[in-house]
Amino acid sequence: MRTLCLYYTRTNTTKAVMENIAKIIGADVAEYTDGKNRSGFLGYVGACFATVNNTILKVYIRDKIDLKSYDHVIIGMPVWAEGPCAIGRALIKKYSSSMPSEVYYVVTHMGGKNDYMDKIKAMDMLLGRPSSGQVSIRTKENDYIKESALFAETLI
């Protein structure tokens, strides 16, 4: 069974989470992006604006990946402005017809008591079918590598 871990990252936290999951389950890893530099404070503000207004016009996977050659795809993305990032949602919408039957979501966020599961499950509408599983990983003041490992172990 081939698995691909796809991720978008602004600060490398989601990248670390997804690389950890990939290492544990023996998956390939690839990054997706809209091609914009979203580093620093202004990058964050722009990212939040794009998420609230859903203004991501393009998204692509950096490496040439044939999604249909995978049995499972795990899509990692951060939370921006209290919801899964617009780039992640754009990826699901654009590539939904190419996704394998098993798709999982990994959403990283700074914290609080909100686990964002209602908003994560809403992404199934973009996918056009229910996802196979989801996890919400808090990264602030939390061992997110350990938490991602616990999720990965459920996939083995």
Q: How would you describe each model-predicted region?
A:
Residues 104-140:
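Short, glycine-/small-residue-rich phosphate/pyrophosphate-handling segment
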Residues 5, 75, 104-107:
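Structural beta-sheet core signal
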Residues 40-44, 117-118, 146-147:
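Short aromatic-enriched loop/helix-cap "lid" or pocket-rim segments at secondary-structure transitions
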Residues 1-73, 82-85, 128-130, 153-156:
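N-terminal beta1-alpha1-beta2 submodule of the flavodoxin-like/Rossmannoid cofactor-binding fold
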Residues 130-156:
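Glycine-rich phosphate/pyrophosphate-binding loop and the adjoining helix
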Residues 67-68, 93-102, 127:
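Short, conserved loop/helix-junction motifs that constitute active-site signature segments
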Residues 87-93, 118-121, 147-152:
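Charged helix-capping and loop-helix junction motifs
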Residues 9-11, 79, 107-110:
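Residue-level signal for short, function-critical loop segments
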